[in-house]
A protein has these predicted regions:
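Short, solvent-exposed loop/turn and secondary-structure capping segments
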Residues: 57, 62-66, 164-165, 189-191, ...
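Bacterial Sec-dependent N-terminal signal peptides
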Residues: 1-30
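Active-site-surrounding "flap" and adjacent substrate/cofactor-binding loops of secreted or lumenal enzymes
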Residues: 46-49, 54-121
Length: 681
C-alpha cells in the first residue's frame, strides 16, 4: 500500500475500462456541460494524420497537468469532482452532526475522516501504532517463524511474497474457492527489476535511497536496508510470472490439495499459514505451482536478518501515509514524484476525503447513490445495454472467420450477459468495524481485518452474484468473466461519457462505446475462454480459435510497433485485452448509432461536423489527457491499458468507417491498407 487505501485482500479478476462517466446535464457546480467543446480542436493538425491532437490539441494546451497530478484527463476531472465536491459535501454534512450512533455508517465516516485530519495526534503517536507488528518481526529467529509472522501480517493487508484471496472457482463459478500466488514487489512488476535502460535503473537507485531514508527516519539500525530490500525483491521478481503470463487463465489455474503444498514447498508450514488466516479448505488454486518451490528455496537460502528487514520495510511502507509527516512526505516523494512525476501532494483535506472513500467506500457510496443517482436513470442505461447486445448479435452473425457452431455458442454467452447499474440492490453491514476519531492506523487495521474476514467467510460457499467489486461513486466500469456480467457504477454515468443534452453521435462515441468495450471483454483473449455460465471452459472449435488467435496476434504486433516514449514501446501482449475491447466497443457503438438512424432524416451538421465525424469526436474527448513521462513509463510497464493517445488513435486505422467519415486518403497516417486492418468483432 503506497497511500492510504483499503486492503480487501482480493485480486479482482475483472476487466475495467479505466474511465469515468454522470447522470445529468450539469456538473457539481450546476454549470452546463457542452456535448463537445469545439475549442478542444486544434486545426494545425489534420484528423487523418493525428486524430488525437486534432480533436484534443486545444484541450491539451489549455489543461496542463496540475502539480498534484501525474495525469490529467476527462476521467481525472470527473474523479476529482465526484470526490472533492460531491463526497466532500456528504462528509461535511455528516461531520456537523452531533451524537452519531456508534457503528452507524455516519459515525464511521465522520470519525475516519477526523482521524486523518488529526495531525497533532498522528505526530504525537509517532511509530507507536505499528509497534506491535515491529515487535513481532523483532522476535523472529528462523524461516518458520518468519513465515508465520508474514501470515499474521497479511490479514491486515501487509504484503509478503505469497498472496491469498477468495473468488469464484473458475471451473465451478457458482462456488467460492481459495486462490494463492505471487506478491511482494514494492515496484509492482518484475520489469522494474530487470530492465537496464537509464530511467529504470534510476528508479531502482531512487528506491534504494528511499528505503534507506525511511529506515533512517524511523531510527532503525538495519545494515544497508535499501540494498537489502532491493536485492531481495530483485531475486523474488525473477521467480515470478510476467504480467503477460498472468493473463492466461488456463496457465494460472492450478488446483492442488492442501497436502500437496507441503510437497511443493517442504520447508514452509502451509497448514499454519492457512489457519492463521482463518482459512478452512482442502484445496488451493495456484497461479504458478513452481513458484512455491522457488520461494521455498529463496527463503531458506536467505539470511534471517534480510528477511526481517524486508518484512519490516513492508510494514513501514504499508502504513507510511498514516504516520507522521516525515514518513508521509518521503513516501510521496518516491511513489508519486519519482515513479509518476507528481510534483506536489494534494491538500490534506482532499487526501482525507480520498482516504475515507478508499476504506469506507461502500457506506459512502450508499449516501452518494441516494443523492446523485435516481433510480429512473437505470432504465435509460438498461436500454443502452440492450441496444449494444442486439448489435453484437448482428455482428456475430456477419463474421466470416467464425463457424456456425462457434457462433451458436457465442450467442448463448451474449444472451446470458447480466448487468448491474448504479449501485448494489443490497448493502453490506459494516457496523462491526470499530472506527475512532483519534487513531488512524488502527482504523486502517480494523477496516482491513473486516475485509479479510468477510472474504474468508465465503470460502466453500456459493457465490453471491449480487456483490459489487466497485463502489457506486467509482468512475469506472468492468466486466467480470466469472459472473459473465458488465457493471456500470453511478459515478461512471456522467459527461463526457453520457450527457443527456448531447446529440446522439457524441453519446454513442462515449457511453455506448464504453458499454460495447465491456461487452467485448467477454470475447477478448481472456474473456473468450469463459463460457456463458462464467466457467473456464472452451466453447470454440479448434479452427475458430486459431482464427481468433491469428487476428489477436496481428493486433498485438500492431501495438508492439507503437513507441510511446523513446525506448518504451507499448506491450501489445499486455494490452491486447483492452485493445480488443476498444476496437470492439467502437465498432459496436458505430453500428448501433447507424441502426438507430435508419429511416430517419440525416442529423444536421453541428459545428460543421456530420454525425459520423462527431461520433469519433465523442470517442476522442473521453480519452483526452496529458501525462508526465514518469507516469507514462510506469503505465507502459505495468498497465494492461494502452496510453490515452493510443487508445484514441490506435483502433481508428482499422476502421474503414473512420476513413470514410473524415475522407482520408490511402497515404494518410490514420489509414491502413485493407489487408493490414484487423477486424475481430
Amino acid at each position: 500500500m503506497r497511500d492510504i487505501k483499503s486492503t480487501a485482500g482480493m485480486w479482482m479478476r475483472a476487466s475495467a475500462v479505466v474511465a469515468v462517466l454522470a447522470a445529468g446535464q450539469v456538473n457539481a457546480q450546476n454549470k452546463p456541460v457542452p456535448a463537445f467543446d469545439k475549442s478542444s480542436i486544434d486545426n494545425s493538425f489534420k484528423p487523418c494524420q493525428d486524430f488525437d491532437n486534432y480533436a484534443n490539441g486545444g484541450w491539451k494546451k489549455h489543461n496542463p497537468i496540475p502539480g498534484t497530478e501525474s495525469r490529467w484527463g476527462a476521467f481525472n476531472v470527473l474523479d476529482k469532482e465526484n470526490k472533492e465536491v460531491r463526497l466532500k459535501g456528504i462528509i461535511n454534512t455528516i461531520t456537523t452532526k452531533k451524537n452519531l450512533v456508534k457503528g452507524s455508517e455516519e459515525q464511521q465516516i465522520a470519525d475516519f475522516y477526523k482521524s486523518y485530519l488529526d495531525v497533532a495526534t498522528i505526530e504525537k503517536l509517532g511509530l507507536t501504532p505499528i509497534q506491535p507488528y515491529l515487535l513481532q518481526i523483532d522476535a523472529i529467529n528462523n524461516v518458520q517463524e518468519w513465515w508465520k509472522t508474514a501470515a499474521e501480517l497479511s490479514k491486515i493487508g501487509i504484503t509478503n511474497i505469497f498472496g491469498v484471496y477468495v473468488d469464484a472457482d473458475a471451473l465451478d463459478s457458482k462456488m467460492n474457492a481459495v486462490y494463492g500466488g505471487q506478491d511482494g514487489l514494492s515496484l509492482g512488476e518484475r520489469s522494474y527489476y530487470e530492465r537496464q535502460d537509464e530511467s529504470t535503473q534510476n528508479v531502482r537507485k531512487e528506491f534504494e535511497q528511499h528505503v534507506n531514508k525511511m529506515f533512517s527516519l524511523a531510527n532503525w539500525k538495519d545494515a544497508n536496508p535499501g540494498k537489502t530490500v532491493l536485492d531481495f525483491e530483485t531475486k523474488l521478481a525473477l521467480l515470478q510470472l510476467t504480467n503477460v503470463e498472468l493473463r492466461d487463465p488456463v496457465k494460472t489455474y492450478n488446483k492442488v490439495g492442501v497436502g500437496e503444498l507441503k510437497t511443493l514447498a517442504p520447508d514452509l508450514d502451509w497448514l499454519s499459514y492457512l489457519s492463521i488466516n482463518g482459512i478452512k479448505t482442502d484445496s488451493v488454486i495456484l497461479q504458478d505451482k513452481p513458484y512455491l518451490g522457488k520461494v521455498n528455496n529463496l527463503l531458506t537460502s536467505s539470511d534471517i536478518n534480510t528477511l526481517k528487514t524486508y518484512l519490516r520495510w513492508q510494514v513501514l511502507t504499508h502504513f507510511a501515509g498514516a504516520l507522521p509527516a516525515k514518513f508521509d512526505t518521503e513516501n510521496f516523494h518516491f511513489f508519486a514524484t519519482v515513479m509518476r512525476g507528481t510534483k506536489a501532494q494534494k491538500p490534506r483535506l482532499e487526501r482525507a476525503i480520498r482516504a475515507t472513500d478508499a476504506n469506507l467506500g461502500m457506506p459512502l457510496g450508499k449516501l452518494f447513490a441516494e443523492k446523485y443517482f435516481p433510480s429512473s436513470s437505470k432504465a435509460k442505461v438498461s436500454e443502452m445495454i440492450e441496444n449494444v447486445r442486439t448489435v453484437y448479435g448482428e455482428r456475430i452473425d456477419q463474421l466470416t472467420w467464425m463457424s456456425d457452431a462457434t457462433k451458436k455458442e457465442a450467442h448463448k454467452k451474449l444472451a446470458a450477459f447480466t448487468y448491474k447499474i448504479g449501485y448494489p440492490d443490497k448493502w453490506k453491514d459494516y457496523s462491526s468495524i470499530n472506527i475512532s476519531a483519534n487513531n488512524l492506523v488502527q482504523n486502517l487495521v480494523n477496516t482491513a481485518l473486516y475485509n479479510h474476514n468477510e472474504a474468508i467467510a465465503k470460502v466453500g460457499k456459493p457465490v453471491d452474484k449480487s456483490e459489487w467489486l466497485m463502489t457506486p461513486q467509482t468512475v469506472n466500469a468492468y466486466y467480470n468473466p466469472l459472473n459473465n456480467e458488465v457493471v456500470f457504477p453511478a459515478g461512471i454515468l456522467q459527461p463526457p461519457f453520457f450527457n443527456p443534452n448531447a446529440d446522439d453521435a457524441i453519446n454513442y462515441g462515449g457511453i455506448i462505446a464504453v458499454i460495447g468495450h465491456e461487452f467485448t471483454h467477454g470475447f477478448d483473449d481472456q474473456g473468450s475462454q469463459y463460457d456463458a455460465n462464467g466457467n473456464l471452459q472452451n466453447w470454440w472449435t479448434e479452427s475458430d480459435r486459431k482464427n481468433f488467435d491469428a487476428l489477436a496476434n496481428r493486433y498485438i504486433e500492431y501495438f508492439n510497433g507503437i513507441e510511446a516514449l523513446p525506448g518504451f514501446k507499448i506491450n501489445g501482449a499486455l494490452t491486447i485485452g483492452e485493445n480488443i475491447a476498444d476496437l470492439g466497443g467502437l465498432t459496436l457503438a458505430y453500428y448501433a448509432l447507424e441502426k438507430s438512424l435508419k429511416g430517419k432524416p440525416a442529423p444536421a451538421l453541428i459545428d460543421g461536423h456530420n454525425w459520423q465525424q462527431r461520433f469519433f469526436l465523442g470517442w476522442a474527448q473521453v480519452w483526452h489527457a496529458n501525462i508526465t513521462d514518469a507516469a507514462l513509463r510506469n503505465q507502459i510497464q505495468t498497465d494492461p491499458h494502452a496510453p490515452a493517445r493510443d487508445r484514441i488513435n490506435g483502433p481508428l486505422p482499422h476502421l474503414v468507417e473512420f476513413e470514410h467519415a473524415w475522407k482520408c486518403g490511402p497515404s494518410d497516417k490514420m489509414v491502413l491498407p485493407a489487408a493490414q486492418r484487423v477486424v475481430i468483432w
